[in-house]
Regions:
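A broad detector of the eukaryotic-type serine/threonine protein kinase catalytic domain
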Residues: 24, 85, 139-143, 222, ...
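Short hydrophobic/aromatic segments of transmembrane alpha-helices and their interfaces
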Residues: 22, 149, 227-228
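Acidic/His-rich, divalent-metal-binding segments that scaffold phosphate/diphosphate chemistry
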Residues: 53-189, 196, 200-210
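Residue-level preference for alpha-helix termini and adjacent loops
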Residues: 8, 14, 18-19, 26-27, ...
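Alpha-helical scaffolding flanking metal-ion-dependent phosphate/phosphodiester catalytic sites
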Residues: 157-168, 180, 184-264
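Terminal helices and disordered tails flanking the catalytic cores of nucleotide-processing hydrolases
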Residues: 1-100, 110, 247, 251-264
Length: 264
């Protein structure tokens, strides 16, 4: 399986992963040969590239659960993009709590391991995909840690919103997680604080979300101002955020393995 940028796709290449639209409808299945129309669709969807099979490569097995996970990710990234963009325009995120409830139904009550799929990110879509994955991981952690339903809801909403105003940063800084200069770290910290300020108290969100986000910001970027006692919700967010950042797949960067992330 190799990754091919959208501009380098060729008619007849076989897809290694399925492609869904924003409503979760399967457009192209695994092992389908991509057509000229399909290549145009990829570009219109804003996809930066696809995983394809090499000419003689057999199709690797993929469970129904894994395919459902990819479908869920695709739909929720589109929905989360709309909700975060609404807040950036000073509008109510009308469907954010429904997205929270849907995610908790899917991942907030599991008793078995899942194959956590990392989706490839561009600088333009990094914030949305990162926020969704942190929310999924936070839901999994919160269940195993015995959080109440209210706490689970708070941690998922906070995960959705924790990088909100990074959308205003230059694209190359949005997904940069290693080797930040002091100036870049300051830019990111200011963006995160501005994001908290953009979350209106009038929004229909869990009451503790803004406090949780400020606490998380202090732990991540302003440790000298962080309280000594870190809440369990913030601890879950720190772990989920670090795991996703460490294992994320970005163009031009080699991801770390899950084993590396656990040892981190």
């Amino acid at each position: 399986m190799i990754y091919v940028k959208a501009e380098d796709l060729k008619v007849g290449m076989r897809l290694a992963r399925p492609i869904y639209n924003k409503r979760g409808i399967l457009l192209y299945g695994r092992n389908d040969k991509i057509t000229r129309q399909g290549i145009e669709s990829v570009k219109n969807f804003g996809l930066i590239g696809l995983y394809v099979l090499e000419p003689a490569e057999p199709l690797a097995p993929m469970s129904v659960e894994e395919m459902q996970f990819e479908r869920f990710q695709t739909m929720e990234v589109f929905r989360l993009r709309d909700e975060l963009n609404a807040i950036m325009m000073n509008k109510e995120p009308a469907h954010l709590m429904q997205a929270t409830n849907d995610l908790l139904k899917q991942f907030g009550n599991l008793y078995h391991k899942i194959n956590f799929n990392q989706n490839l990110r561009s600088p333009e879509d990094y914030v949305y995909k990162h926020a969704l994955n942190v929310a999924i991981l936070s839901a999994l952690i919160s269940h195993r840690a015995g959080f109440s339903l209210m706490e689970q809801s708070e941690v998922v909403v906070a995960a959705f919103l924790h990088d909100l105003v990074k959308l205003n940063l230059q694209p190359e800084l949005r997904g940069k997680t290693e080797n930040l200069t002091d100036e870049e770290r300051g830019q990111v910290a200011r963006a995160v604080i501005l994001g908290i300020d953009k979350i209106s108290n009038a929004f229909n969100l869990p009451a503790g979300v803004k406090g949780t986000l400020m606490h998380l910001c202090q732990v991540q970027y302003l440790p000298e101002n962080a309280p000594k006692d870190i809440s369990d919700i913030v601890k879950a967010l720190v772990v989920a955020n670090a795991y996703d950042e460490y294992t994320a797949m970005q163009i031009g960067m080699d991801p770390h393995t899950e084993v590396d992330a656990v040892r981190m």
